[in-house]
Each structure stands twice: as structure tokens, then as C-alpha cells.
């Protein structure tokens, strides 16, 4: 009986010692509003995964523009426009060719992103097995982006 109790105790101790203390699964990785500038641009905290830092940061920039266009910014201090630029149902699929070109690497989306609000320590890093997850602060020029989408016939005025 003592040996069985000792074996169960050791097994329990081994499980407790090897428990994963990783808190990254609980980290909020939704885009959030940090503020709105007088020119209508929105300062956002955006998260993305990538193979390395460069990939993750580039994906963050794409995610920021994508959120403003298709989802609106619902989290954060509430200053950002919660309404997406495109409210049409299935617009992403309807204009897939346009947005594939728009969001390609070094694509047109970069014209509407600014890193002016990035400061030291504004990048946060979480490491996973094969990928890294970064959160950065970016500014999206919503007004110019809206003008571009109107000019290109994606949204109506």
C-alpha cells in the first residue's frame, strides 16, 4: 500500500513539475484602437504570426489595413470608427483579384500605413514552436484609404 501511494505521489509530482506555464494562449491578440488623429488616421495595436520578425511585422501591417477595410475596429479605447469601410456582404470574395494585388508584398496597402507612432518597446513578441507572434503599433490613414476605394469603384460614395 505504501509503495502504491509513493508511486502515485511521484507520478503526480512529475505531472505538476512538467506542467506548461505558457501564458501566450491567453494573450489578447485582437486588433485594438489606441487613438484617432485629427487627420482621421487611426492608431492601432495589431498582432500577427510569421516565420521570423520581418514576416510577422509585415503581416501586422496587412492585418491593420484589412481590419479597417473589412471588420472595423471594435476593441480598444473606442475612438476608432467601428464601421468597416466596406459593408457589402462577401466583398472580399467579390473583389478578390483587386485585393490580392492590393495586399501583395510591397503592395499598395503600404501607402496607407505609417509607423510614426512606433516607439521603443511598442513591439511585443511571443514565441511559439515554429513561428513568432508580434504586436506592433501602426497608424492607418483611413480617409486616404476610403478615397482610394471610392476611386477604384470598390465602395460607393
Language-model region placement:
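Domain-level marker for long, solvent-exposed, non-transmembrane regions
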Residues: 19-157
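Bacterial Sec-dependent N-terminal signal peptides
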Residues: 1-22
Amino acid at each position: 500500500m505504501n509503495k502504491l501511494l509513493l508511486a502515485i505521489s511521484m507520478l503526480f509530482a512529475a505531472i505538476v513539475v512538467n506542467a506548461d506555464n505558457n501564458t501566450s494562449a491567453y494573450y489578447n491578440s485582437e486588433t485594438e484602437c489606441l487613438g484617432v488623429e485629427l487627420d482621421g488616421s487611426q492608431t492601432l495595436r495589431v498582432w500577427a504570426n510569421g516565420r521570423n520578425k520581418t514576416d510577422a511585422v509585415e503581416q501586422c501591417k496587412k492585418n491593420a489595413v484589412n481590419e479597417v477595410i473589412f471588420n472595423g475596429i471594435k476593441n480598444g479605447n473606442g475612438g476608432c470608427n467601428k464601421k468597416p469601410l466596406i459593408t457589402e456582404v462577401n466583398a472580399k470574395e467579390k473583389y478578390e483579384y483587386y485585393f490580392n494585388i492590393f495586399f501583395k508584398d510591397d503592395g499598395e496597402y503600404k501607402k496607407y500605413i505609417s509607423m510614426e507612432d512606433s516607439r521603443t518597446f511598442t513591439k511585443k513578441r511571443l514565441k511559439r514552436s515554429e513561428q513568432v507572434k508580434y504586436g506592433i503599433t501602426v497608424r492607418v490613414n483611413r480617409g486616404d484609404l476610403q478615397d482610394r476605394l471610392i476611386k477604384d469603384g470598390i465602395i460607393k460614395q
